[in-house]
Amino acid sequence: MERVWEAYGLTEEEYRKILKTLKREPNHVELGVLGALWSEHCSYKSSKKHLKKFPTKAEWVVQGPGENAGVVKIDEKVWVAFKVESHNHPSYIEPFHGAATGVGGIIRDVLSMGARPIALADSLRFGEFNYHETKRLVKGVVSGISFYGNCIGVPTVAGETVFEPSYKTNPLVNAFCLGVIPAGRMYRARATREGQLLFLIGSSTGRDGIFGAVMASGEFSEDVEEKRPNVQIGDPYFGKKLVEAIMEIVEKDLIVGMQDLGAAGLAGSASEIAAKSEKGVELYLENVPLREKDMNPYEILLSESQERMLLVVEEENVEKVKEIANKWHLEGAVVGKITDDDTFRAYYKGELVAELPVSLIVDEAPVYDRPYKEPEYMKEVRNFNQEELPQTDVKEALKKLLSSPNISCKEWVYTQYDYQVGTNTLLIPGHDAAVLRLKWVLRPELTTEKGIAISSEGNGRMVYLNPYEGGKFVVAEVCRNLACVGAKPLAITDCLNFGNPERPEIMWQFVKAVEGMAEACEELGIPVVSGNVSLYNETVEKNEIRNVFPTPIVVGVGVLEKAEKYTPSKVEKESELYLVGNLEENLRLDGSEYLKVIHGLIKGDVPPVDLEKEKILINLLISFNNKELITCAHDVSVGGLLIALLEMVFRTPYGLEVEVYTDERPDVFFFSENPTRVIIGVESDKAEEVKNAVEKAGLEWMYIGKTTEEKKIKVTFNGDTLLEDELEEYEKLWRTSLEKLLGST
């Protein structure tokens, strides 16, 4: 038998399943549809079994996983929809366009729920700067994100950028979007009866992005030139017009449901609507507005051209929808209808070019229970004893850490984004979480005094060292960040970036990370309402397989009772500084930036998260914010305590005086990244009340210093002065190091 299935990304076993169901050989177009919809990117065939472990329900959850975005209640007037998604493979091939279309795609996911997009965030991973392509990739990706986000008028308010060798030839570009919905006005990818029409609105259809879903479900080789046509090209100006047109259509209640056109194009969107509606669908491909000549049915069905949406419309509303499309200078045409059988049919100029059971395309996509086993490297990385590390000079170590691209200021990145467009951003990038007000310009009666907070986190290094504990570590940090600004965590969305699931060692990383994340979500009472899985993040380079660190990215959304009542991460007034949280756990350097930068090691085990104490700390921080008992709060994370303290005073008028007494080694105390620890600023007249509240909650506190009016830093450790300098030289290192690495200064 000719191995025809391989060209469509199918396995022989999958092809035999298709033959058995159809009782005939599928044609070229049908194979294209099945190859795209059965790809890992669309079907989640390796991960679906394990994703069921996540908690997804809560009284404030309106829509959990299974739709284009999750939806949660903010109050009786406002809901929010949000999701994070990857665009990793396209961003390596074409950094600018890959990243830009990643932003466009996630905006349309949220838009398809009937939500107006109001905020973006991104989580980026690149190789280190000794790799010649890193500068090009960073500049291209950041330019692509800023181009699309700035032009479409949605602020990029949060994110993170990390550099590790494992991402050298496989960068990770994860984009998040959040939108607001009037309560009760949510849409789904659904039809309600046969005879309803499918209306394609937006840009015209070209050949860009064909095979995009299949490409995103395979490993890379060094030669990516041949894959460039698989990368979609986005147009944010067209995207902006599409947003406004959809908002007008929704406001006038002219549609039944909608679905954006993303992976697998029209074939994917139409079959998903049919499957979720338990109906069939007919498509008339000659009606699709085209931008290129001589496109064949295969190309029309599977094109992933951007800025397109598929609307379910009653026949009597078609002309009204067309008028709105014309008003916004968008293409618009009826391209199909809903039928009462379980069949996907595509016609081209009267000829039937594809006929498949909807259930086969969507519901019967294979689900694999892949084998998994602990990788051999685990024995090597666990062989670590921090007591054997040589003592280092704290001052020199601090300077090296401030120069690390993982710690140095990311202003070069986020100042390219317009994070204030829309004038709703109250707490800008550089804090533990962004804070936004929920303001409706056109519908002031829907404005609420509540605010939302957004935080994005990932720690591939920790997950690599212990996927189970690392999964807990990441979820806990996101929730802690939200609480630091005073927000109650409501829900998370995740993007699970892993290597090839056909390798048992990679599948073990995935399974254990999901289990750890699920446990943290259960214990902290945080549902997972949406997400994305990105597998096959590996590169074959000179016959050597290079896998990325297992990298679950978690974006959390929280609510503040009053938008303007938040806690900043920066010092805004003179304060005493206290470390609060779980201070009884032995401090460890395992997996820390200090261990990597100063000692060249990625070793150890993940410092465990005490989820019970984490939950107490989260509630305590929210209480402190509501009672206005603290002046600032910042969690101890990458770089450790001393880095966190400096981050709180950099870009402020204040200096820092650190004074600690402990039995720990100086390097362990200052650079450990143990979780469940937060630095808070307290005015002296409120210190006793705060300390009493910490003790009453069952947590620990430690006085670690104070801010000063003089812009200096002084660190004393058990009575010995370790450093005493002008703060400016440390701040300059932190502020300029990344720009210098990028050749921008």
UniProtKB/Swiss-Prot annotation:
Binding site for substrate: S86, H87, N88, H89, R108, Q232, E304, S305, Q306, S534
Name of this protein: Phosphoribosylformylglycinamidine synthase subunit PurL
Function: Part of the phosphoribosylformylglycinamidine synthase complex involved in the purines biosynthetic pathway. Catalyzes the ATP-dependent conversion of formylglycinamide ribonucleotide (FGAR) and glutamine to yield formylglycinamidine ribonucleotide (FGAM) and glutamate. The FGAM synthase complex is composed of three subunits. PurQ produces an ammonia molecule by converting glutamine to glutamate. PurL transfers the ammonia molecule to FGAR to form FGAM in an ATP-dependent manner.
Species annotation: Aquifex aeolicus (strain VF5)
InterPro entries the UniProt entry points to: PRibForGlyAmidine_synth_PurL, PurL_linker, PurM-like_C_dom, PurM-like_C_sf, PurM-like_N, PurM-like_N_sf
EC number: 6.3.5.3
Keywords attached to this entry: ATP-binding, Cytoplasm, Ligase, Magnesium, Metal-binding, Nucleotide-binding, Purine biosynthesis
Organism placement in taxonomy: Bacteria, Pseudomonadati, Aquificota, Aquificia, Aquificales
Keyword Cell membrane on entry: no
